[in-house]
Amino acid sequence: MSTRTVVIASASGLHARPAKLFTTAAAGTGVKIAKGDDEPVDASSILRVMALGVAHGDTVTLSGADESALDSLAQLLAKDLDAEP
């Protein structure tokens, strides 16, 4: 299993719109997301992702077998999703 560590760029962290964009992109990938030493959760579950309480500037770890999905999701989190049209 591979991992990617990402600093959250969205001003509101992974709440509301950024969480929806992220979890939609993560659907079907099998990727998990964790904040700090917390237990990883399914990255496609908006409720579980929002429950992590990830804020702007926090570091999260993505894990999974699909390298391409990990890269895409890491790039997504590294952008300010609040600023996306």
Model-derived features: where do they sit?
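Intrinsic-disorder/low-complexity, polar/charged segments enriched in Ser/Thr/Lys/Arg/Asp/Glu/Gln
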Residues: 1-5, 59
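Compact, glycine-rich, soluble single-domain proteins
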Residues: 7-47, 51-54, 64
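C-terminal structural segments of small proteins and small subunits
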Residues: 51-85
